[in-house]
């Protein structure tokens, strides 16, 4: 989204935003069942926002930052909430008649790509994962002054692990 938190599912579904992000319809046209939820802090899950217009004074960013900070200060993290929501969505998706539970995959770009990495390492139902624009180590980001996506701020993770270890923890059929 290029920090465009006012977009979420609508961009992936091809309704607004960059056509390069509209992979949902392409997958659906090719026979995939596609579920595109708004992640917390994006589009319809933003605080004090409705629709796809950005909030003034960069409030979409500040709301996202606050959401991360409040969770870290209370001993939690934003990625945990995103993963809980995503795993619940996968449970609901897998209950739909015609959905092959053995062939559930996940695809994401940027923050979605980070979510793919964590989700595919933790949820055994995922048989395919494709993370785009996200496989950059914490060490590389810090050494080169590259931003760290807010949901990837997981207290104490960097002391023990690196982002790329998430792919090693998976039993995936395919990783792109």
What kind of feature is each model-predicted range?
Residues 121-127:
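Conserved hydrolase catalytic core segment
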Residues 25, 117-118, 168:
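Alpha-helical segments flanking ligand/cofactor-binding loops in enzyme cores
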Residues 98-110:
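Alpha/beta-hydrolase fold nucleophile elbow
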Residues 1-84, 141-144:
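Cap/lid segment of the alpha/beta-hydrolase catalytic domain
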Residues 108-120:
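Glycine-rich nucleophile elbow surrounding the catalytic serine of serine-hydrolase chemistry
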Residues 30, 96, 123:
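Conserved dinucleotide-binding and phosphotransfer motif residues
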Residues 35-38, 130-131, 176:
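A structural signal for short, well-ordered beta-strand segments and their strand-loop junctions
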Residues 65-73, 88, 127-173:
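Mobile cap/lid helix-loop segments that gate and shape the active-site cleft of serine hydrolases
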């Amino acid at each position: 989204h290029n920090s465009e938190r006012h977009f979420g599912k609508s961009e992936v579904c091809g309704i607004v935003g960059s056509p390069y992000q509209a992979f949902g319809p392409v997958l659906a046209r090719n026979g995939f069942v596609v579920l595109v939820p708004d992640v917390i802090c994006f589009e319809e899950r933003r605080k004090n926002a409705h629709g796809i217009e950005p909030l003034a004074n960069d409030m979409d960013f500040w709301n996202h930052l606050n959401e991360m900070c409040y969770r870290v200060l209370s001993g939690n993290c934003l990625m945990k909430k995103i993963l809980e929501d995503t795993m619940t969505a996968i449970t609901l998706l897998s209950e739909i008649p015609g959905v092959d539970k053995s062939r559930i995959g996940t695809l994401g770009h940027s923050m979605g790509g980070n979510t793919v990495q964590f989700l595919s390492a933790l949820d055994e139902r995922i048989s395919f994962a494709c993370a785009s624009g996200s496989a950059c180590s914490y060490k590389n980001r810090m050494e080169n002054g590259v931003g760290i996506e807010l949901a990837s701020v997981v207290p104490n993770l960097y002391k023990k692990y690196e982002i790329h270890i998430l792919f090693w923890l998976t039993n995936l059929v395919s990783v792109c």
